[in-house]
Amino acid sequence: MPSEQDIASIPHTLLGKQRLASLADENGDIDSALLAFQWEMDARRTLLAPAGIAEIALRNAIDQEISNWWHNNSFPGTWTDKNIPPEATILKPFVHPTGWEKRASKNLSSKNRPVNHCDLIAHTSFGTWKNMIGNPIAINKNPPTEKKKLDSWNAAKQRDKECALLWKNILFSAFPNIPGRAQRGKISPRAYIGARVSRIAALRNRMFHWDNLTALDIKMRYRDINEVLSAINPLLGTWLDSSYESEINQLIDDKPSWLKPYLSKK
């Protein structure tokens, strides 16, 4: 049986001195740190399902529109095939069938059939779709003076041009219900979706890498998810709220009072 001293050391072993200090109340109470850590665990569990739903809806909506465009142009096969015709070069910067096939093959439940298009789509990363849309408002309008930073800025600008072209020709139709200018402000429809998808991606990374969630604005990140789903189909946003909004609100209410206030980044 572990001794009382062994049991007392568990929080330090689990979280480390710095993490304990960041979670504890103003008195540095160990029990308060463990309670805060449990809230973080609950936050991950509560946010995971909505974030997963957003990923599934996003990839299916984009795949559907690219597939429609592909077939409307009478291209052979599917857009995830290795040989993209010259007329479809707009997709080349974003399509990586060899890597997708390797990932899908590893996770295929049955090894007795070849990997198909649906398998590839199901096993893509969230970043695949985020990178197709881009996030234009994240790119500084003014080029930096330092050469290394300027090279990165130029590469980001070029990539964003490719995203803008893909959006203009195909992806815009995956989000037919983006709010009008009066609601979304001065940003473009692509920027509206891109900013939200990028924040959802950052949220996923924080959850999966076990980063600190105490400063996260839970309400705003859930709102990002809802707004992306609603832009695809308003019924998705309504269904999400009916399934998860009360749990999200309860999570916010249950946040320990001594934790840092939210850092709201819209």
Predicted regions and their residues:
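Amphipathic alpha-helical interface elements
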Residues: 1-203, 208-218, 223-266
